[in-house]
Amino acid sequence: NGPPPIILAFFFNTALDQQITKFKADNGREPTEDEYQKIKAWTLSTVRGTVQADILKEDQGQNTCIFSTEFALKMMGDIQEFFVHNQVQNFYSVSISGYHIAEAGANPISQLAFTLSNGFTYVESYLARGMHIDDFAPNLSFFFSNGMDPEYSVIGRVARRIWAVAMKNKYGANERSQKLKYHVQTSGRSLHAQEMDFNDIRTTLQALIAIYDNCNSLHTNAYDEAITTPTEESVRRAMAIQLIINREWGLAKNENPNQGAFIIDELTDLVEEAVLKEFEAISSRGGVLGAMETGFQRGKIQEESLYYEHKKHDGSYPIIGVNTFLNPKGMAQQDIELARSSEDEKQSQLARLADFHARNAAEAPQWLAKLKQTVIENGNVFAVLVDAVKYCSLGQITTALYDVGGQYRRSM
């Protein structure tokens, strides 16, 4: 998806600017060139974070694609190559995402199969560029949705099992590379506009199984997501769900409390088998990119989404307060605050952008030209981006890259 490489370059520059400002405050002078390079190297090796930048799930589920798939994959490889050369080891170069695939309608099996197969596609792509598996595998992270289906209670352990086996046996990766790290966000799709207060109950259950399945990090959705961008009050309630589970709920103090339970072990084997079967279906269509050309993933997501909606509307999938156990008093009028930017906020942003353009009017054209030339010569685009963002805006860079990288066109 378009902005992440550029936003990441902004982020790295912000981290570096903070350290340079600190050096000047501590020493009362500008750093020498040698000192600047040492500060830059230390900053890049220390900074922590995650950038999503997953073009494959964009095509399959989220649809915010702006560059051609080939060019987007090249930029992802450029980011990881930059990370390897600059020892950026605490930052995740991609969050390989199943969340958006699930939110678009995929069931938990398809979510996991598509996400892991996308992950292996990135591995093959980076290996083809000459990177060593243990230099980049620890920089990969995953992002899953947790819904109401029982399969979600084992999605993490199945992902870790499949990933570890492939990393060890196929790619000869070390132990650190075999460890799959993943973030879970509770399912926004499972939250409903009817009797919204019930949504906190759904989110609590989803959060609980995510924690029991040893997720590395967790996002709990706000109850009013079905209607608006969450308010301050609803965000506090969502945060309280995590805090109560982690601070008050005693069983959560024990890792993996469901380990060894018959249903968990049985589900783990069944889900793994189903995911491996999906791998075969993808492989028979020429792998992930070959399957994308025929719309295989998108078609499957749409079929599963339609199946869910049918069951929701005919009542065969019970949703309390939506299609069963309806409130006898009817829907109460709910006053929900809709989140909107004020006119002052909009004008302030436009004014700051215009000021940035004016200040860098002399330097921007040469950096945009250098970016284009780097793409034409098949150089590392991200290495140039890190400097170009000091003078060029997101819109200027995107427009320039369209000219040489191509815009996204869906295969019909």
Regions found by a protein language model. Give the residues of each.
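Active-site capping/gating regions of soluble enzymes
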Residues: 75, 97, 113-122, 129, ...
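Catalytic alpha/beta active-site cores
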Residues: 1-146, 151-152, 170, 179-183, ...
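Alpha-helix initiation/capping motif
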Residues: 43, 54, 68, 132, ...
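Flexible, glycine-rich loop/tail regions that form catalytic "lids" or insertion modules at the edges
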Residues: 240-243, 247-412
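A short, flexible low-complexity segment enriched in Lys/Arg and Gly/Pro that occurs
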Residues: 33, 64-74, 187-195, 362-375
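A short glycine/serine-rich beta->alpha loop
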Residues: 1, 104-107, 190-195, 226-228, ...
